[in-house]
């Protein structure tokens, strides 16, 4: 089968379908990582999005059993230049094509991903549809663009409830006792906490502050997740109540939630930061780290001036806020992903810093 990808600016490309023969819609974004397609596909922060990989070949090592960041493919659709159909890693269980088929997610191959990336970089992330079709039944351009016009904007989607756990569960035993508010948490975050001896309990995004304090945690992590942080009012209110009661760390969406909880504001980035090569400067240490990132929203630095939040990390490329520290309470947050998954391990020490804070308090 064939497939078409249509963007809201009128761009339409045709290619070969792989994965599931169903239609997909969402915000079309790009990731600049050279490897890590499995981690990207299973990252809950990609819910509601059609993902373009800028590196040309994808699928060349197959799907490995221990690598996924969640139990399912989270992207709505997958766009690649070349789909590898040859030998895969000896430990791989299935191919990328089979993986997407199993999870009901369509992909399109054989398209100019460089052109698409340049367009999104210039014009910004935009709505799109991925439509499979038989070669003798190609949809018209107007039909495709009409479908695009019906796609909701990412800020109109309630995505966190779709990816958050529905019931509290225990991930690991140990000390200090950490509660993770699941807004779409990646497994790598839980693994990094457990690796350092922490006891980890995961709770739904809408768990109240009182319910969390009843667990008697030594610290709370507000996880990554998809979409606009202003759509998760319950989590913002919970964090507002927890500040000062227990040490807090936010990651990615959790960074934005901490900012909103203290009266800051967020805004949508033009095309977001998605990849494993984002340089971030730590103003406290006067050092630059290469980080893994996946977000389309950011904290407005001007909105933080009258709040108890101090900017500690900034993006070297565009100057956006990459993390804040609370000046009156044991709390901080980072916009980047210290756990990587995929990406560099330069900032895994952030977990050590947080757990030390939990032990001190």
Curated annotation (Swiss-Prot):
Residues 1-173 are annotated as: CPSase. GO terms for molecular function: ATP binding; carbamoyl-phosphate synthase (glutamine-hydrolyzing) activity; glutaminase activity. GO terms for biological process: 'de novo' pyrimidine nucleobase biosynthetic process; 'de novo' UMP biosynthetic process; glutamine metabolic process; L-arginine biosynthetic process. PROSITE patterns: GATASE_TYPE_1. It catalyses: hydrogencarbonate + L-glutamine + 2 ATP + H2O = carbamoyl phosphate + L-glutamate + 2 ADP + phosphate + 2 H(+). Its EC number is 6.3.5.5. SUPFAM superfamilies: Carbamoyl phosphate synthetase, small subunit N-terminal domain, Class I glutamine amidotransferase-like. Pathway: Amino-acid biosynthesis; L-arginine biosynthesis; carbamoyl phosphate from bicarbonate: step 1/1; Pyrimidine metabolism; UMP biosynthesis via de novo pathway; (S)-dihydroorotate from bicarbonate: step 1/3. The keyword Amino-acid biosynthesis applies. CDD domains: GATase1_CPSase. Composed of two chains; the small (or glutamine) chain promotes the hydrolysis of glutamine to ammonia, which is used by the large (or ammonia) chain to synthesize carbamoyl phosphate. Tetramer of heterodimers (alpha,beta)4. This is Carbamoyl phosphate synthase small chain. It comes from Methanopyrus kandleri (strain AV19 / DSM 6324 / JCM 9639 / NBRC 100938).
